[in-house]
Structures are given as structure tokens and as C-alpha cells.
């Protein structure tokens, strides 16, 4: 099976690619520094493969990159796309872009599988680490269900080696945390001492987060915990 993986050198891709190769797939990485050097925001060479696993993402232009990728696909029988829980329920610009990517995949005519995942442990750590740089740490009143990139990678590899399944069950971490607990865990682990102050997230997005629209209480759950992740840093 010939598989092309976009973003195969990133946080998620570095776990997905070895899993696919271990399963016997012929894997080509398409990224700025991959087997095929390519910026999906520019001209994309023709992609001939059985399966495309689309993991590449950035701060801007994900919808454009996804449309460029889809236009370059030739004879692809299955496209696996990673998205984010809350893409259709949390009114933030970057999540609207993720939903636009999903819409483009669904309208492409290519058989597809879309997996929405929760925020990765890596991103959660970056967020709380950034907050902890302040002398007084603002703690948003929200809950998160962070998932380990390895758990998401395992699920994506299974999906890529299987048949197109459309939208599959969301995947989140094994536990739900209040943001204050995530911050407290990081401060304790890193030996930092900070005053924390609760803050209310404003607007419709804040309401969505307070309502748990970023969670997957009825979805699938990974096995690696936030505590294990922190201990390994």
C-alpha cells in the first residue's frame, strides 16, 4: 500500500509514519523537509498514492492548503484527515478554518475518513507554560480533555490501513481537567511558585468552552494521561 503523509515530520506525523512503515506500507512524507519538499500553500505536485493522510497544519491557511492538496490527488482511494473537536461548535476563527477543511474533504469526491481529536498534551503544555511566565497567572474557567499525540497517531494509522469510514468517533484523553488543575500540575512539576487568578472567558466562544463543546465525553479515549506526559518532560 502506497501512502503519502502530509506533515509527516511534525508533532503527530513523527508518530504516524513509523507505525505505517512497521505495518508494511510504502510511506512518502510530504512536508517542507520531507521526502517530497512542498509547501501546501503553494504549488503542490501531483500526488499518486492509494492513501493520503493529511496531518499538515499551521497558524493560517489550512483551508487553502487542504484544497490545494485535494486538487493534486490522482487516483487516491482514501484520504484520512485530522481535525479538531469543536470545529463546528466553538466559534473561533481557527476552528472555523478546520471546519472549512472538513467541508472541502467531504466535497472532494475522494473517499475519506475524518477524525476529530482533542488538544494534544504538547499544546496544552505550551499553553500553561506560557501562562506561567507571568508573575500572576490568569486561569480561564474552562475544562480540557487533552490527548496524547501517540494515541491519536495509533488511531490514525489504524484508519489509514482500513477502509474509508466518513466521520468517525472523536478521540480525546482519558480524563477531563479543569484548567486550574492543569496549571497547578505544571507549576508543581516545574517547581514554580505563582499566584493564580481565575478569569472568565468572554463571548460566545467562552460560553462554548464553559459548556464543554471542546470535550468528547461520549467519544473514544486514549490511554496516556496528562500526569504521565508531564512526568516524562
Regions found by a protein language model. Give the residues of each.
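Mid/C-terminal beta-alpha module of Rossmann-like enzyme folds, strongest
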Residues: 10-11, 150-233
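N-terminal Rossmann NAD(P)H-binding glycine-rich loop of SDR-like oxidoreductase domains
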Residues: 2-25
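A short helix->loop->beta-strand "cap" motif at the edges of active sites that frequently abuts
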Residues: 74-78, 110
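Short-chain dehydrogenase/reductase
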Residues: 6, 63, 91-102, 142-150, ...
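A conserved pocket-lining segment of Rossmann-fold NAD(P)-dependent short-chain dehydrogenase/reductase
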Residues: 126-147, 151, 163
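SDR active-site strand-loop-helix element
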Residues: 6, 30, 55-56, 79-84, ...
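NAD(P)H-binding glycine-rich loop region in Rossmannoid oxidoreductase-like domains
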Residues: 29-74, 84-93
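Conserved beta-loop-beta element that borders a ligand/cofactor-binding pocket
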Residues: 83, 88, 102-123, 172
Amino acid at each position: 500500500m502506497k501512502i503519502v503523509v502530509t506533515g509527516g515530520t511534525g508533532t503527530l506525523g513523527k508518530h504516524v509514519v513509523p507505525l505505517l512503515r512497521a505495518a508494511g506500507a510504502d510511506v512518502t512524507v510530504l512536508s517542507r523537509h520531507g521526502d517530497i519538499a512542498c509547501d501546501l500553500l503553494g504549488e503542490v505536485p501531483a500526488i499518486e498514492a492509494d492513501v493520503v493522510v493529511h496531518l499538515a497544519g499551521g497558524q493560517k491557511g489550512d483551508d487553502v492548503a487542504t484544497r490545494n492538496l485535494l486538487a493534486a490527488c490522482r487516483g487516491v482511494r482514501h484520504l484520512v484527515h485530522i481535525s479538531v473537536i469543536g470545529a463546528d461548535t466553538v466559534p473561533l476563527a481557527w476552528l472555523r478554518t478546520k471546519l472549512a477543511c472538513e467541508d472541502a474533504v467531504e466535497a472532494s469526491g475522494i473517499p475519506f475518513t475524518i477524525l476529530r481529536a482533542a488538544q494534544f498534551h504538547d499544546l496544552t503544555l505550551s499553553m500553561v507554560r506560557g501562562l506561567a511566565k507571568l508573575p500572576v497567572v490568569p486561569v480561564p474557567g474552562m475544562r480540557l480533555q487533552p490527548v496524547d499525540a501517540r494515541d491519536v497517531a495509533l488511531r490514525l494509522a489504524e484508519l489509514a490501513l482500513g477502509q474509508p469510514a466518513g466521520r468517525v468517533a472523536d478521540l480525546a484523553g482519558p480524563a477531563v481537567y479543569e484548567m486550574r488543575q492543569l496549571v497547578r500540575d505544571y507549576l508543581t512539576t516545574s517547581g514554580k511558585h505563582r499566584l493564580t487568578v481565575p478569569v472568565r472567558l468572554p463571548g460566545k466562544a467562552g460560553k462554548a468552552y464553559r459548556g464543554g463543546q471542546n470535550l468528547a465525553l461520549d467519544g473514544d479515549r486514549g490511554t496516556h494521561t496528562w500526569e504521565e506526559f508531564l512526568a516524562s518532560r
